[in-house]
Structures are given as C-alpha cells and as structure tokens.
Amino acid sequence: MKVAVLGAAGGIGQALALLLKTQLPSGSELSLYDIAPVTPGVAVDLSHIPTDVKIKGFSGEDATPALEGADVVLISAGVARKPGMDRSDLFNVNAGIVKNLVQQIAKTCPQACIGVITNPVNTTVAIAAEVLKKAGVYDKNKLFGVTTLDIIRSNTFVAELKGKSATEVEVPVIGGHSGVTILPLLSQIPGVSFSDQEVADLTKRIQNAGTEVVEAKAGGGSATLSMGQAAARFGLSLVRAMQGEKGVVECAYVEGDGHYARFFSQPLLLGKNGVEERQSIGKLSAFEQQALEGMLDTLKKDIALGEDFVNK
C-alpha cells in the first residue's frame, strides 16, 4: 500500500508524515511531496526511524514521481490561517493549489483514494471533484474531505466536561468543516447527557476550536499537530479498510445523495474501494435539527464557490 502526502514539509504534513512512518502497516510505502526544497530531507530524517515503512521525498513543481502508484493521497498543501482570518479567507490561495495538485493526481494515479485536508474543506473538496470530473476519472466513493479534527476535538471536550476518558468517547460530527457547518451530534453519545446550556456551549466551542488555536499561537500558526493526528487517524483507517479490515467507520465529507447538500460529512463504512456505505445520521435532537437546517445555505454556498472556481 502506497500513501502519498502532498504538502509534506508544512506543519500538518510533517506531523502527519511522522505518524504515518510510525503507524502504517509493515511493508507500506510513504511518499512525501512539497514544493519546498527541504522535502527530500524531511524524508531522510524520518527514514532513520526504525519501522518497516519505506519513505521517499520529492520537491519542486512536479508531484508526479511522488504520486506514481499511490493508493491513498492526502493533501495538506496550502497556507495556514492567521489571526483575524477565517477558513474562507484561505480560499484565494488554497483553491489554486488544490486544483493544480488534483490535476496531477488525475493524470498519474486516478484510481487513488484522496483525502483533502487543505482548508476551506467545504470548498476545496468541490474543487477536487470538478477537476476529477473534467478529467473523466471522478469516483465519489474515493474523494474525502478530512473532518476528523472536529471528531477528535469533540471527543476531547466532552471527556473533559464529563470527567470521562477521552479514548472512550466517540462523537459523530456531521455537516461541513467550518464554523456553523460543524455539527457534533452530542445527543448520540451513549451514557452521556447534557443540559441545554452545555449543548449550546460545547457546540460553539467545537465550531470555534480552530480559532482558539490560531489565537493561542499568537500569529505563529494554526492547528497543525492535532490536525496531523486527525489526518493520520483517517488515513490509517482508510488503509486498514482498503486492506480488507471489516467494520471501519469514520465520519468524512463526501458526495452523497444530495439530500442535505451535494457534499456532506456523515458516518461512512469504509472498504476496499473507499466508501462502502454512507450510514444514516440517525435521530437528531431538536437543537441539532435546527442547527442542521440553519447551516445548509452556508454549506451550499461554500460548495458552489468551489464548483464555480473550476468551471468559470
């Protein structure tokens, strides 16, 4: 199984590469690409870690050598948020980067499963889909927006609030991956109940957690380490499912039946070819139902922005 990380010299990319080097199954190949000249050196650095994962690094304008034979491609390339920016301010720079990289994927490894980490995910996934469609290689079961950071944050914050072990809490998060489009389904956590105020406060904290990190880093970056962990969790789940492990479920942002929006994050059963089954979002509380209805306009606008960027 070959995994390629695009944007591997950045804060997320390096953290992700480290976790994949130490956690991918024995015999896997890890391929690192970034425009930055340091990238082959990042691979050399990681190659000294004693695991049975072969690693190579590539830099420059052309990602082709890194993509050849890739089964999974994780895209973390792009600029990070600074204080005062929201994820959509990133659009102008990151849209072009994602478009370019996905065009190269469409040429070199069109069968690969793709996980898009680059923000704004609500929009960059739509860009990726349209690029793949234009190239005639789009498979909606193989393109994912990685929203796992919202899930791990939810797990952490709920565990803190309720005095539970963070490893025992699993919160489904649906919708999108910015602001009001992030909807943690707090009503669906077994054996945990919340007051209305706790639900309102927790939901808001989960939605604004990225800003919390941006502000705490005081202009020195955004959430890179927790995002690296989240992306690794998603990538490793995908690899395990593609290698035949049964019952692997992760939430991610994918094209579904369009019931809520063309792209929507929901629980997915993963399999050998990506998404095996889009699972139901289950029964929502009144608060969740209202939040869901309230986000759809924003989500649809974010998606249209990406579609128009490719098709204009």
From Swiss-Prot:
Entry superkingdom: Bacteria
One Pfam family per UniProt: Ldh_1_N
Annotated substrate binding sites: 81, 87, 119, 153
Principal EC category: oxidoreductase
EC number: 1.1.1.37
Record keywords, A-Z: NAD, Oxidoreductase, Tricarboxylic acid cycle
InterPro entries: L-lactate/malate_DH (IPR001557), Lactate/malate_DH_C (IPR022383), Lactate/malate_DH_N (IPR001236), Lactate_DH/Glyco_Ohase_4_C (IPR015955), Malate_DH_AS (IPR001252), Malate_DH_type1 (IPR010097), Malate_DH_type1_bac (IPR023958), NAD(P)-bd_dom_sf (IPR036291)
GO MF: L-malate dehydrogenase (NAD+) activity
Positions annotated to bind NAD(+): 7-13, 34, 94, 117-119, 227
Active-site residues per Swiss-Prot or TrEMBL entry: 177
Gene Ontology cellular-component terms listed: cytoplasm
Any one Gene Ontology BP term: malate metabolic process
Subunit structure: Homodimer.
Entry protein name: Malate dehydrogenase
